[in-house]
């Protein structure tokens, strides 16, 4: 029997890792699962978070699996199957991956007998949909166009008329999309799987990819990353002040995503997440050293690093 291959896509900070954690800890508990993580950069923060669930995690950090590292992606899938013999592989691409490019890579004839593409999921951040679309519409529309299921995340407190507008936007691009408008934190893993797998309408991947112009997925912004490890103790209050400084785009560039695992001055570890002027923290297990990853475009890395000194 072929290994099931699920792909969980979504822009930076949309909630991909949160969704995968829900699936592996609550939904697919009876299956042998391996997660293939394609981090944007070489500091695997999301990889460490997923490993903390007890699931096997492999990672690709050399590039994006939709383009420059597509060969590494397929080789990694083959290696995972040979090494772990899993029931299911869940792939989390980078937040700036073109989902259509990943699906095209999966159609490589040499690997057809190894796996079967099962769930193709994109996570959309409802609260920041307009913000993200303003500079990454090509990525967002590409993910919508080729997904089987769209999960609307971070939807608590959002006006129903706005969500209805998102439904219309999605259906205008992908009429057959299965849309899930549930709070990921409140829905059970089993109910989530049922909503994902039992409501898929007709899906012809080759036909969809043929209709999608490859040039349409080019993005005018060139995202870059600044990442580093540190043994310095940094309080969360200091992190909030640093990220407040990033509102000065002339000095630091446009910061669209930040995440890290750090130790505070009381020797307690915590994880922080930053997306569009909103930052939050949660406690974390002990690490050997802290790590920070900042993603954006036109980054002034020297000025950013000065804030952490």
Regions found by a protein language model. Give the residues of each.
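Short, well-ordered beta-strand elements
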Residues: 290-296
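Short, well-ordered beta-strand core segments
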Residues: 120, 149-151
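Flexible active-site lid/hinge loop adjacent to a nucleotide/diphosphate
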Residues: 130, 134-146
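Short, hydrophobic beta-strand segments that form beta-sheet elements in well-ordered domains
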Residues: 34-36, 259-262, 294
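Nucleotide-state-sensitive switch-loop elements of NTP-binding domains
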Residues: 2-133
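Residues at alpha-helix caps and immediate loop-helix transition turns in enzyme cores, especially N-
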Residues: 101-102, 135-136, 162-166
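Short aromatic/hydrophobic contact patches that present stacked aromatics
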Residues: 90, 151, 225-227, 293
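C-terminal accessory "lid"/substrate-recognition subdomains
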Residues: 142, 146-149, 157-286, 298-302, ...
């Amino acid at each position: 029997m072929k290994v099931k291959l699920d792909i969980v896509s979504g822009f930076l900070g949309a909630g991909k890792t949160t969704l995968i954690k829900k699936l592996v800890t609550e939904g697919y508990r009876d299956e042998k699962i391996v997660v293939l993580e394609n981090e944007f950069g070489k500091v695997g923060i999301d990889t460490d978070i997923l490993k903390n669930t007890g699931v096997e995690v492999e990672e690709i950090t050399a590039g994006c699996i939709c383009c420059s590292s597509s060969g590494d992606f397929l080789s990694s899938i083959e290696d995972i199957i040979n090494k772990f013999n899993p029931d299911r592989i869940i792939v989390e691409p980078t937040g700036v991956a073109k989902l259509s490019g990943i699906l095209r890579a999966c159609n490589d004839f040499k690997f057809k007998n190894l796996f079967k593409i099962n769930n193709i999921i994109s996570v959309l951040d409802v609260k920041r949909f307009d913000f993200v679309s303003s500079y990454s519409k090509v990525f967002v529309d590409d993910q919508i166009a080729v997904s089987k299921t769209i999960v609307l995340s971070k939807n608590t407190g959002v006006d129903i008329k706005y969500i209805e507008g998102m439904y219309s936007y999605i259906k205008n691009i992908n009429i057959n999309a299965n849309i899930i408008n549930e709070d990921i934190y409140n829905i059970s893993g089993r109910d989530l799987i049922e909503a994902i797998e039992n409501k898929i309408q007709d899906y012809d991947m080759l036909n969809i990819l043929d209709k999608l112009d490859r040039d349409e997925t080019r993005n005018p912004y060139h995202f870059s990353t600044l990442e580093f490890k540190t043994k310095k103790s940094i309080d969360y209050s200091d992190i909030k002040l640093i990220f407040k400084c990033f509102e000065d785009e002339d000095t630091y560039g446009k910061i669209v995503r930040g995440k890290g695992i750090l130790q505070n001055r009381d020797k307690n570890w915590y994880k922080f997440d930053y997306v569009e002027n909103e930052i939050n923290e949660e406690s974390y297990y002990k690490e050997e050293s802290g790590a920070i990853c900042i993603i954006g475009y036109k980054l002034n890395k020297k000025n950013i690093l000065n804030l952490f000194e």
